[in-house]
């Protein structure tokens, strides 16, 4: 497996629709000129943005978090340019970008240091071969203070690995439960 460069990412996005919408360069300023958390193509990855759709965790309605029997009432829907995550809590969001992963590619997603250095951890599972959809993002606030997430700015970096061999069974072939997801998607069994 080899890690893919900015040149490959641009080609796959522009010729094959791998990332939509796609930013071929690194964006560090908003249209009005103020600094933002960067997003777009980097040397060996793509910095993804968070949309303005959040699901903020609340423990008002639930006593237990059970991934096999998840209660959707455990979240409050928030549509905003910022999301304030309470201390020691978390939120879900989705990317601005829609991904279509080639059959011979696997991605790993890592949080941006801007957020990590503030105690905000971004967790995203790998994008498997032939998976497509908006990415559900998990934000954990590890601090004893409220933490702010900015919509339409960079939150994590996707690194693309191309295999030297095509997999026998892709995520699409398996009928993966998160295939083609739109919006913020809660756990499924």
Curated annotation (Swiss-Prot):
Superkingdom of source: Bacteria
Positions annotated as active site in the UniProt record: 138 (proton donor/acceptor)
Which BP terms does GO give this entry?
Answer: dUMP biosynthetic process; dUTP biosynthetic process; nucleobase-containing small molecule interconversion
Note the Gene3D superfamilies from the entry.
2.70.40.10
Listed PANTHER family: DCTP DEAMINASE
**Binding partners and assembly:** Homotrimer.
Functional description taken from the UniProt entry: Catalyzes the deamination of dCTP to dUTP.
Q: What is this protein called?
A: dCTP deaminase
Protein's organism: Nitrosospira multiformis (strain ATCC 25196 / NCIMB 11849 / C 71)
Q: State the taxonomy lineage.
A: Bacteria, Pseudomonadati, Pseudomonadota, Betaproteobacteria, Nitrosomonadales
